[in-house]
UniProtKB/Swiss-Prot annotation:
Keywords: Calcium, Disulfide bond, Glycoprotein, Hydrolase, Lipid degradation, Lipid metabolism, Metal-binding, Secreted, Signal. The active site is at 65, 111. The keyword Plastid does not apply. It comes from Pithecopus azureus. It comes from the Eukaryota. This is Phospholipase A2. SMART domains: PA2c (SM00085).
Length: 146
């Protein structure tokens, strides 16, 4: 039991730096869910890595988000650890970076759009799609949208 507590706390500490922490806050604000529990191993794309065909609308949100992070990485940004500023006022998320062309703003937009996608499809959330082993995902993946 002590090992499980240690592992959980370590995972929480590792993933609270930079934009991953802010992304979690956005998801929590819009869905009321704790992303470390609700989205970390959801479907074929939510959480670290991803391949195969998305299982549902929530998983599609994650696939599109992975593609967005891929574009950020390809352009020299670090979407996992680059902090950014955002506001949440009257149930509205806004990226508030002053440099609208810089990495922080673009990464924030990736996270904001994914969080809104989760909110829009929250009624379809299916806890049976949580699977750390990602069974049934296959190898054929959809192309990233432009």
């Amino acid at each position: 039991m002590a090992f499980l507590v240690f592992a959980f706390l370590t995972l929480m500490a590792v993933e609270t730096y930079g934009s991953l922490f802010q992304f979690r806050l956005m998801i929590n604000y819009l869905t009321g869910k704790l992303p470390i529990l609700s989205h970390s191993f959801y479907g074929c794309y939510c959480g670290a890595g991803g391949s195969g065909w998305p299982k549902d609308a929530i998983d599609w949100c994650c696939q599109v988000h992975d593609c967005c992070y891929g574009r950020m990485s390809a352009s020299g940004c670090d979407p996992y650890f680059q902090p950014y500023n955002f506001s949440y006022i009257n149930k509205n998320l806004q990226c508030v970076e002053t440099d609208t062309s810089g990495c922080p703003r673009r990464i924030c937009e990736c996270d904001r759009l994914a969080s809104i996608c989760f909110q829009q499809h929250d009624a379809t959330y299916n806890s049976s799609n949580i699977d750390p082993k990602r069974k049934g995902c296959g190898t054929k993946s959809p192309p990233c949208p432009n």
